[in-house]
């Protein structure tokens, strides 16, 4: 899709304005890392703290449309996985994969998204956390926020924030990537061993 097509839908393909807005912010203790890493919250100089936020984005609209077509609330469960893995994959790019703490935010239009849908999103978090635990990725759900923002949101927004401590010696710092290094990329489509169905 062309840049103009994105812009006509209210989406910035480059986010130049956002980059300009944050240009004077601290880059953290590893400025070249994929995510911002800051001083360790516990004050240990051998550790740092990773915090990352992302969400399911426009997949919320797809889940809502599928629910409206089928009447099946289970479509909302997948938003938890979409929101969570947008964070786990980014933190994994920094080498941060252990003992993650999760907080989430669900913003909804209560005229369209009822408590049953919210319950399914939360159930989805419980399910994906259990599946990831079976793969050695331990995440503790620490609660979150559910906001009724019908004046801002047409259906719902599902966002997650992950926090973890990491040993500085184990951080993957993208600033250290050099010519000749091998970068392995994994396709995001298909079906992982912990998934119930094909994932696009």
Q: Can you say where each PLM-predicted feature lies in the sequence?
A:
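Helix-biased detector of long, well-ordered alpha-helical tracts
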Residues: 1-200
